């Protein structure tokens, strides 16, 4: 079980070509390329989402993790969120996906974030759906910032929509100062490949919007 703050920058990329150009321009070392499957949970009326929470079960290379994220605080272009997460067995993940258990069961009930989410959801959560994300992680040296891990994502959303983006997580300590220098460095890197620095919204929100478009 881990608990921490996540401070990250997200910028949209127009297409796969831009993603490849960004990786080349960063001139770093590709650390990994993994496929993630993300399952989102909420109450039927999306009460968690309405109160700023995101509840996710993720499978990556056979490893399963439940993550609860709290409401977002903006730090410039960066998003600052508290989160708590727990690794679980494939068997427990299967029970959650079958509706026989809730992801909230595996989280630390003594953590304030979990208590708030449980009170909000009344423990009645269902699986809303899932989406796939390919993540390429590149370690690079960003001018004016220093060592950084860039996460270059390709996300498959409902309706055949495919989004691309780059993420950079900033250490929570001294987040305001670090986020500002990271934002400048990442904007400069995008400028070098001729891509405008357009902040991206969270994947869960884009997934739900794409899901609603299908239903509508």
Across the structure, where does each feature detected by a protein language model lie?
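Phosphate-end processing signature that detects enzymes handling 5′-triphosphorylated RNA
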Residues: 1-216
């Amino acid at each position: 079980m881990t608990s921490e703050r996540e401070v990250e920058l997200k910028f949209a990329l127009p297409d796969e070509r831009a993603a490849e150009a960004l990786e080349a321009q960063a001139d770093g070392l590709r650390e990994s390329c993994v496929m993630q499957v993300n399952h989102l949970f909420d109450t039927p009326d999306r009460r968690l989402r309405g109160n700023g929470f995101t509840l996710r079960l993720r499978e990556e290379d056979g490893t399963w993790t439940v993550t609860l994220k709290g409401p977002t605080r903006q730090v410039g272009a960066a998003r600052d969120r508290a989160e708590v997460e727990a690794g679980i067995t494939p068997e427990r993940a299967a029970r959650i996906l079958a509706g026989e258990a809730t992801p909230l069961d595996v989280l630390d009930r003594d953590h304030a974030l979990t208590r708030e989410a449980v009170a909000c959801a009344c423990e009645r959560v269902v699986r809303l759906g899932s989406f796939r994300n390919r993540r390429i992680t590149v370690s690079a040296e960003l001018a004016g910032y220093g060592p950084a891990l860039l996460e270059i994502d390709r996300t498959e959303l409902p309706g055949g929509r495919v989004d691309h983006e780059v993420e950079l997580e900033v250490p929570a300590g001294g987040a305001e100062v670090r986020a500002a220098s990271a934002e400048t460095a990442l904007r400069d890197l995008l400028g070098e490949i001729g891509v405008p620095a357009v902040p991206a919204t969270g994947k869960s929100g884009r997934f739900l919007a794409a899901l609603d478009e299908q239903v509508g």
